[in-house]
Amino acid sequence: TSNEDFYLVQHYGQPEVDNDSYRLRVTGMVDNELDLSLSDLMNGDVIEQEVGFECGGNSQRLLYGLIGNANWRGVTLTSILEAAGVQDGAKEVVFFAADVGQEEIRGREVDKAFARSLSIEDAIRPENMLAFEMNGEPLPHYHGKPIRLLVPGWYGVANVKWLTQIHVQNTRYMGRFMGRDYVTL
């Protein structure tokens, strides 16, 4: 699927992220917190793979045809987690994005970044990557420039765009897009 024809869904808009000032932070239950530039990531343990995924909202009534396949290139998530040194007792890895929206929490409107999580076991799968290229081109803005999490075999919502932080923790993450929307039971 071409970059232009690959389906688009976002929950909080499309933030502008500057490649030159971009930083990815790795925090939480790690031995070494990381603060990585785009260049750091592009010079890491790079893999390339053909991966397709679809929107979790696909149906005959609401959304239809939100599916795509592309050639992705990026650094392995495992290499980043290994460099940070995930501590014993860690259970989940939370992926925070640059896109921010309003959520109502206990009757108050609060700014929250889009986020999804994976169990440690799912996060360390060798095919997971932090993608910076799509179909041989730098990752387009509308597909998550400069870095997008790619989790082959999962619905599109798990493939967090505009990634800014990876946080390792010992509890389940229960943000809106894990605990209320897109709930997996």
Predicted regions and their residues:
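Structured, non-membrane catalytic/scaffold regions adjacent to prosthetic-group chemistry
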Residues: T1-L185
